[in-house]
Design a protein with these regions (language model features):
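Terminal intrinsically disordered/low-complexity segments used for targeting and assembly
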Residues: 2-77, 124-126, 141, 165, ...
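Short flexible linkers and secondary-structure junctions
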Residues: 22-185, 324-328, 347, 358-368
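Periplasmic alpha-helical coiled-coil/stalk elements that build and connect Gram-negative outer-membrane
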Residues: 157, 173-288, 399, 403, ...
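Heptad-repeat amphipathic alpha-helical coiled-coil interaction surface used
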Residues: 89-91, 96-98, 113, 161, ...
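Membrane-embedded beta-strand positions in outer-membrane beta-barrel channels/transporters
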Residues: 72, 142-146, 190, 289, ...
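Sec/SRP-type N-terminal targeting helices
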Residues: 83-84, 100, 137, 151-179, ...
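Outer-membrane beta-barrel proteins
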Residues: 118-122, 228, 335-339
Length: 518
């Protein structure tokens, strides 16, 4: 009668040993207070956001600046800060792989061979031949395979994988945050550079106007129709304007150098020509406050760090339970060496061991308490990061709203100041006022023009900041699961986002969507 051996019980036992149980708390994201509206945008009602309710893809195209469009994609591939964080992410992925390996047995093979001279008085019969004076030459050898396996009965290894996987995702989110931060820094530097160019154009026009005023005053001085002090005043104004124009070159050079470094180039490698065009103020869809939890990579980093700390509690708790190991050996051993692989020389062994700590002076309880404290610190960091995110967006929105009002007022002020300068100069030529009145009007006009340009710069910077504080089109759905390496892309989403086709942001609001900020 034949015996049938079923593989099902063996498979079930293996599954039990592999699965075991997992001690320690399972992770659940803690609740945070999320406002229904942004206070700086009254009338906003909470709704599920549509795809158009956040910056998308190449958000920088909304500024309509050729330099920005050319350089922004280079940040993700050439910026050295991003490169460093990418390497850190690769290291984190490797740590997940290392942790996963502990789930499986370690298989090895050992081979050895020995040839030795035995003493003449040896009684061993394991020799192949004799040499002079009765000495013996002994040959021996072995070929063995061995297996060792530490069983993860309590989930310590799986909690370690959970911890390392969450850490890897935190590293990926950190990479995304670094990429976004460097892209916003580039946008800021380009805006500063363009503002510097606009200031240069303004002062060049001012110098030209002052040269004309000085020429008129100098001609009148030749005929004695004006006081000599008028010439001095006009010349002083002109030279001050020229000095200010020269000084702008320092700041512009620094902005250009910063731009080069942000795209991974030496400053001398990047020549940025002067441009008279300022970037366009983009439309920035804001969306509901709750969506910021998914859009900000720094929040994702904090959340994943929290998950990693939660897993360490399980690792610490697992230390209370015994460690169970299995081992096996299978192979051949023979002395003398001839016929090593014969069935008669076959050997094997199976074994197991269990180790349990009886007393550790409170070490394990201390480890558990420390893990729980670290988790609570991570929770506080997560909630603090969320609060800071809401603060950042509110600051950006209030800045854009107030600066828009200031820009409207300055437009009127610049028009009036320009007209006032014309009137003052005409009155001076008519002899009804002295040149001090003209100089005062000119100074007021230049100051108002520079202030208006500064406000325009601030609005652009706030718009860039708002885009960054909303996540720049990033989403935590782009995070990869490092436990499934086959699904990992060659480059994480943060680095590949820069090559996304340009996506123009829409100024149309969907039902219940956030009004666009202009």
């Amino acid at each position: 009668m034949k015996m049938k051996i079923s593989c099902k019980p063996i498979a079930a036992a293996a599954a039990l040993l592999l699965g075991g149980c997992m001690v320690g708390p399972d992770y659940h994201r803690p609740q945070v207070n999320v406002p229904a509206t942004y206070s700086e945008l009254p009338g906003w009602t909470q709704a599920q956001p549509a795809d158009a309710d956040a910056p998308k893809g190449a958000w920088w195209t909304g500024f309509n600046d050729p330099l920005l469009n050319e350089l922004e994609p280079q940040v993700a591939v050439s910026n050295q800060t991003v490169a460093q964080d990418y390497a850190n992410y690769q290291e984190a992925l490797a740590e997940v792989k290392v942790a996963r390996s502990a789930l499986f047995p370690t298989i090895g093979v050992t081979g050895s061979g020995t040839r030795q001279r035995a003493s003449a008085g040896s009684t061993s019969s394991s020799f192949t031949r004799s040499v002079g004076s009765g000495a013996q030459i002994v040959n021996s050898g072995s070929l063995e395979g061995n297996v060792s396996w530490d069983l993860d009965l309590w989930g310590s290894v799986r909690r370690t994988i959970e911890e390392n996987s969450a850490t890897a995702q935190a590293s990926e989110a950190t990479l995304a945050n670094a990429t976004l931060s460097e892209q916003i820094a580039l946008a800021t530097a380009v805006i500063d550079l363009r503002t510097s160019d606009a200031n240069i154009d303004l002062l060049q026009a001012t110098v030209k106007a002052y040269e004309h005023f000085l020429e008129v005053v100098s001609n009148q001085d030749k005929y004695g129709t004006v006081a000599p002090s008028d010439v001095v005043t006009a010349r002083t104004q002109l030279e001050n304007a020229r000095a200010s124009l020269i000084a702008l070159g320092v700041a512009r050079a620094q902005y250009a150098h910063a731009i080069a470094v942000l795209v991974g180039k030496n400053p001398e490698e990047l020549n940025i020509p002067h441009s008279a065009a300022m970037p366009t103020l983009p439309t920035v869809p804001v969306g509901v406050p709750s969506t910021i939890l998914q859009r900000r990579p720094d929040i994702a980093t904090a959340e994943r760090q929290m998950a990693a700390e939660n897993a360490t509690i399980g690792i610490a708790v697992a230390a209370y339970y015994p460690t169970v190991s299995l081992s096996a050996l299978d192979g051949f051993t023979q002395s003398p060496l001839g016929g090593l692989l014969h069935v008669a020389n076959y050997v094997w062994s199976l074994g197991g061991s269990a180790t349990e700590t009886i007393f550790d002076g409170g070490e394990r309880s201390g480890e558990v308490a420390a893990a729980k404290a670290n988790y609570q610190a991570a929770v506080a960091n997560y909630r603090g990061t969320v609060l800071t995110a809401f603060e950042d967006v509110e600051n950006d929105l209030s800045g854009l709203r107030i600066l828009a009002e200031q820009a409207d007022a300055l437009d009127t002020a610049v028009r009036d100041a320009t007209h006032g300068t014309e009137i003052a100069f005409n009155e001076y030529q008519a002899g009804t006022v002295d040149y001090t009145t003209v100089a005062t009007a000119q100074a007021t006009q230049l100051a108002d023009q520079q202030t208006a340009l500064s406000v325009q710069q601030s609005r652009l910077l706030d718009a860039a900041s708002l885009i960054g504080d909303l996540g720049g089109g990033w989403s935590d759905s782009q995070l990869h699961d490092p436990r499934n390496p086959d699904k990992l892309q060659a480059q994480p989403a943060a680095a590949s986002a820069a090559s996304t086709p340009a996506a123009q942001t829409s100024s149309t609001t969907s039902q219940g969507a956030q009004p666009a900020v202009q």
